[in-house]
Amino acid sequence: MEPEPQPEPVTLLVKSPNQRHRDLELSGDRSWSVSRLKAHLSRVYPERPRPEDQRLIYSGKLLLDHQCLQDLLPKQEKRHVLHLVCNVKNPSKMPETSTKGAESTEQPDNSNQTQHPGDSSSDGLRQREVLRNLSPSGWENISRPEAVQQTFQGLGPGFSGYTTYGWLQLSWFQQIYARQYYMQYLAATAASGTFVPTPSAQEIPVVSTPAPAPIHNQFPAENQPANQNAAAQAVVNPGANQNLRMNAQGGPLVEEDDEINRDWLDWTYSAATFSVFLSILYFYSSLSRFLMVMGATVVMYLHHVGWFPFRQRPVQNFPDDGGPRDAANQDPNNNLQGGMDPEMEDPNRLPPDREVLDPEHTSPSFMSTAWLVFKTFFASLLPEGPPALAN
């Protein structure tokens, strides 16, 4: 006869997915089959599930009844975790009694509703009275479904004891909804401009003084256009900056000194670029060309700084805006008292902005053109830093 195999004890930890019961730890043998393990669980598990209703899962795999534990469980581990999934057809006694009590309470409520149809409108009042008259122990038990079922089983047939939310949560939801609706109402009222704040108890009455009567013809009509134009110019352009220039990329730029807005990184970049230019010019050119380019560069830099202003830029005489002055001298009644318009008197006279310019300004000389070409060529060789943006 073959000797019987020695039992190999193994520890199994059975877990329930729905967490209705605590984890069950039991001792078994590796020689057991899955069907024998299910039979053992039907005796020791709290709900006594039948073997046909049990499903055992290990490492994500469903265990079949004919399989053996020694073929499924590794030998290196002494403790293994199994998940038990079962369909309990006989629930505990407590839910049965609670459902029976709920059904028994619903029947008289239905009869009362048919006899007294006016009672349905007072269900909300009865709910509030029950919530208001709850004892501290009742508030503590409100988190348990059994206590909620026993407390609110007489409220009416339309309220079930097995609701998704508890009664306390439903009351909170109602308060949150009312508060949100009230805040939306206040926001809409404030946006429309019809919101009137409630007067406070410490409000002091103030007697408003009547405004003085306006003086008739206080401001003459002949001074009104000039004063209005001057005020409009002061408002539109208060303290205009003379160094302001327009930027094609958007926004104004201010003509400021480059040395103020340049940091050490800009100076390092300029020095590196200039050193590379000098090295290329020195190694790939002769000494005479190098000195000539250096001299021209120094002269260009001094001219750019302002030491050698070769040609002064002519001052542009902008035509004077005679609008306010003409408006001040104009008769408010538009009477022809000041004579006719000069343009009407002399039709051959050209306006000031269309006068013929000086021939010296219209046709540039040959020297100015040559100097402009020379300046543009050498200015393109010099590195130019980024423009300073206005804050």
UniProtKB/Swiss-Prot annotation:
Cytoplasmic side: 1-263, 311-391
Phosphoserine: modified positions: S135
Region (Interaction with UBQLN1): 115-200
Biased composition (Polar residues): 95-124
Record-annotated membrane-spanning stretches: 264-284, 290-310
Domain of life, per lineage: Eukaryota
Localization, UniProt: Endoplasmic reticulum membrane
InterPro entries named in the record: HERPUD1/2, Ubiquitin-like_dom, Ubiquitin-like_domsf
GO molecular function: transmembrane transporter binding; ubiquitin-like ligase-substrate adaptor activity
Ranges of Basic and acidic residues composition bias in the record: 346-361
Subunit structure: Interacts with PSEN1 and PSEN2. Interacts with UBXN6. Interacts with UBQLN1, UBQLN2 and UBQLN4. Component of the HRD1 complex, which comprises at least SYNV1/HRD1, FAM8A1, HERPUD1/HERP, OS9, SEL1L and UBE2J1. FAM8A1 binding to SYNV1 may promote recruitment of HERPUD1 to the HRD1 complex.
Purpose: Component of the endoplasmic reticulum quality control (ERQC) system also called ER-associated degradation (ERAD) involved in ubiquitin-dependent degradation of misfolded endoplasmic reticulum proteins. Binds to ubiquilins and this interaction is required for efficient degradation of CD3D via the ERAD pathway.
Protein name: Homocysteine-responsive endoplasmic reticulum-resident ubiquitin-like domain member 1 protein
Source organism per UniProt: Mus musculus (Mouse)
Gene: Herpud1
